[in-house]
Amino acid sequence: MPFRLAVDYDGTLFQGSWPKIGEPKWDIINKVKQFKEEGAEIILWTCREGISLDQAIQRVKEVGLEFDAINDNSPSQKEYMKKKLEQGEEFATRKIFADFYVGDDAMNLDIFLSINVSETCRRFENR
């Protein structure tokens, strides 16, 4: 299963200015792009919904970010959950599973920026 990274929008990818769309935080955006290039699955993990979510999605596309899921589990996690259900295990949950949750509240962004992307993704490849 690939490394899964869940990233918040307001205050993390973009300056916090809810409900407005803030300015890009390029250091974080570029780090997320590095994870994507290394094969990680990227999840946009935000409390935004409706029109404000649509605006946020449009803005992340404009800065060149691609997400494997938006407020949902990654494709590999969904496949894993499907297999568990087929084996008779109860595996229904609304929880979004990720290896790292990056947000202005969840992880110090300076620590996130210091992570070695290649090494981190490689460590999670064979679990």
What are these regions (language model features)?
Residues 1-76:
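Alpha-helical substrate-recognition element adjacent to the catalytic core
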